[in-house]
Regions:
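Bacterial N-terminal signal peptides
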Residues: 12-25
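Beta-rich interaction/scaffold domains
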Residues: 33-64, 70-74, 81-160, 164-220
Length: 220
């Protein structure tokens, strides 16, 4: 029987420790241990709303969104599509909704040979202005945006933009899109001029999980 020397035993112990350490490294996970894709449980939208981007969470390289449609392919309340811009997003809008109501958007995500089926409840309601008041200088622009998200003013106006939101609503972004094709960031309580282009205001109601895009422009 061959005698095992101390250096051989030490080498074996070191190798075992290294293998054990590799197993403890964060991020070294099997395919089965990866988190499954998920989607928001529910959202609220006004009728005739712009595209809202919905991100699919826990997407990984190689995952593909193969389907994004309203339940029963019924587009009377809401429309849904796969995104042309990002692999982990879908678009939802109510451009062509003929009625209010509640339905679901169904999404399929292919991961390897497995298909993950997701669903999100969508409640579509009639437009109610989220603004308590809105002025540009001395011009009351709130009147124009009372019944629609796309306000057409009778004439151009300039001055300080002053917007107060209703309870639960906040402004997340204001920008102006002009004839040059470039967007310019604006701020509430700062001077604006509608002759430079349409003003877009993104607002959010966190509790309802509702994000809307409002706009102001002079009539053409």
């Amino acid at each position: 029987m061959k005698k095992i020397n101390k250096s051989s035993i030490l080498s074996l112990i070191c190798a075992a420790v290294m293998m054990f350490s590799l197993c403890l490294i964060p991020g070294v996970k099997s395919e089965a241990a990866a988190k499954a894709p998920t989607i928001d449980k529910s959202i609220v939208m006004f009728r005739n709303s712009y595209n809202r981007t919905i991100r699919i969470k826990n997407m990984k390289k190689g995952d593909v969104i193969t389907k994004a449609v309203p339940k029963g392919n019924d587009y009377s309340i809401v429309s849904a599509y796969t995104s042309d811009e990002r692999y982990n997003e879908i678009w939802v809008n109510t451009f062509n909704s003929s009625k209010s109501g509640t339905t679901k958007v169904l999404v399929n995500v292919k991961r390897g040979k497995k298909t993950c089926k997701l669903s999100m409840k969508v409640k579509v309601i009639s437009f109610v202005s989220p603004m308590q008041s809105a002025k540009i200088g001395k011009t009351n622009v709130k009147k124009a945006i009372t019944n629609t998200a796309d306000a057409l003013l009778k004439k151009n106006c300039s001055g300080k933009l002053t917007i107060k939101m209703k309870k639960g609503w906040t402004i997340t972004e204001i920008y102006q899109f002009g004839a040059t094709g470039k967007s310019i960031k604006l701020k509430n309580n700062k001077k604006v001029n509608t002759s430079k282009g349409r003003i877009f205001i993104t607002v959010k109601n966190k509790k309802a999980n509702q994000i809307e895009l409002l706009s102001l422009a002079a009539g053409y």
